[in-house]
From Swiss-Prot:
Keywords annotated in UniProt: ATP-binding, Chaperone, Cytoplasm, Nucleotide-binding, Stress response
Name of the molecule in the record: Chaperone protein HtpG
Domain of life: Bacteria
Family membership noted in the UniProt record: Belongs to the heat shock protein 90 family.
Compartments (UniProt record): Cytoplasm
Species name: Geobacter sulfurreducens (strain ATCC 51573 / DSM 12127 / PCA)
One matching Pfam family: HSP90
Organism classification: Bacteria, Pseudomonadati, Thermodesulfobacteriota, Desulfuromonadia, Geobacterales
Region of interest (A), residue spans: 1-349
Amino acid sequence: MSKTVKKFETEVQQLLDLVIHSLYSNKDIFLRELISNASDAIDKVLFESHQNAAVIEGEPEGKIKLIPDKDAGTLTIRDNGVGMTLEEVEKNIGTIAHSGTKAFLANLKEQNVADHPELIGQFGVGFYASFMVADRVTLVTRRAGHDKAAGVRWESTGDGTYTVEECAKETRGTEITLHLKEEMKEYLDEWKIRSIVRKYSDYVQYPIVMDVTRTEVPKGVNGEEIEGAGTIEKTEEETLNSMKAIWTRSKSEVTEEEYEEFYKHVSHDFEKPLKTIHYSAEGTSEFKALLYLPAHKPFDLFMPERKKGVQLYVRRVFITDSCEQLLPDYLRFVKGVVDSSDLPLNVSREILQEDVQIKRIQKSLVSKILSTLSEMREKEADSYLDFYKEFGPVLKEGVHFDYANRDKLQDLLLFESTATDAGSFVSLKEYVERMPEGQEEIYFITGTSRAALEQSPHLEIFRKKGYEVLFLTDPVDEWVVQGLPEYGGKKLKAVDRGDVIPATEEEKKEQEAKREEAAKQYGDLLSFVKEKLAERVKEVRLSNRLTDSACCLVADEHGLNANMERILRAMNQTVPESKRILELNPDHPIMQVMATLFGKDKTNPRLADYCDLLYDQALLTEGSPIADPLRFTRLVAELMVADGKAAAGE
């Protein structure tokens, strides 16, 4: 194949422009990213060698070599990892094979990339960081196990195009040469390279080597310096990193900086983790785990194709970089490494799904993570709140799916409520502890936002009685309450479902007597309204929950409410046919007006208009769309005109 000039995908070029032209405060990270990629490539070839020894090509030890060339102004990073084919080069570098590309770029544009470099790393495109320091990048690679003539040479100046051609390459792996910008030549200095490797990549388990030239006095056979012999230059390959797997060390031996840099290595995040969990398990299942809770959620946290799971090693041998079986889906934000002593080295994906040791490890990891979160909530409330604001919606999934840990998870939940300021939260335990005497249930309402829910007419009787109502504003909350019917012996009740009216037995008797009296006054009118709205509502009844508003819609005890219908439609799910109950406030002036009109002339067309207006008003107050906005606005305008004329005495 001759040299071919190709264009980057539009999204790749936009990404490159952002990287090249953003003013990073720390450009050193380009080397960390390239070393990390090289380490991953060696992991992969050694893993493949368990099934196919030929890919090793007689070179079983992984190595990463750094080659600074001051004369040429280049820095080369060479690995003997898995390498790439021509197709893989174009897929991994010329394009971004990710459905979230546009969302990611939109996220970058909305934020100052210089302040949020972690967004680049989260997307797994650390290779492009090379262009921060280089005005030309050359990559030569060959897939392990392929013919020596099947190498690939890729080159770009980051100007929107790249060249690619086949070439010969003796050894497997990848060699990246950075043609450094004039002002970036410090990255050719030995001390600079050493300091970067020591700071960012000391824990990488493969040797990171560099040829180092020393000036020394010649020595005799016994090692003594030879007088008068002058000096000679001697070049030797030196290893720059300690290669000690950080997770195998005791916590007392690891510094916070080392923990932080290892987190950045495994997560491709550029920020510090919020929490580090480092522990060893012994007994029926022996393993070491180094886990991290990120400070911020990645942009693709809710994308189904996102890679999930932590890295799995068996006796320090890399197995996979995303073992989904080690953690349940609701903990998919956790990053880190698990190193087992009990699993076989040739473990397959099928074995991972069924292996009893994996299940034991998962149980231990989940228990440790949840206990850490519980401890944070008790002792580091501010940190836990930061975590919950980022990952609360994901953690809530566990209440629905993980019955075994439901009791632990329910104590980690936080909600805003009618008794908290915006941005402040209450736990279920705190809610129960401050329930007033006589309150027997935990009340909640679901919706799209606190601002919308605060205006809900369903809250009126609860506010009047001083009962706190939880605001559940995450879509997942509808499933949370299905999996959490009660807490601490108190049932959870939705204030917009059924006949949930907080009252003592005596109050209930008074309400029933009042309702019977109102039914005598409004009974025929209620039948009329129900007849007019028969296609839209299941029932029309007088309300005990309204104190100020004229009307509201409520669902049956187990029916779909407006919020659940919205969520199902947003998910392109079929929404079952259902009618709700229209409740009318017997003490509202509109009821008296309608009753008067109804008593005078049951055929008055204005009565049918009032029925439509009340139903549409109930929809609008809950945030639901109305079927005929034009008719609604026309009726409102007509009422305004009539009211204005009456006020003017016309």
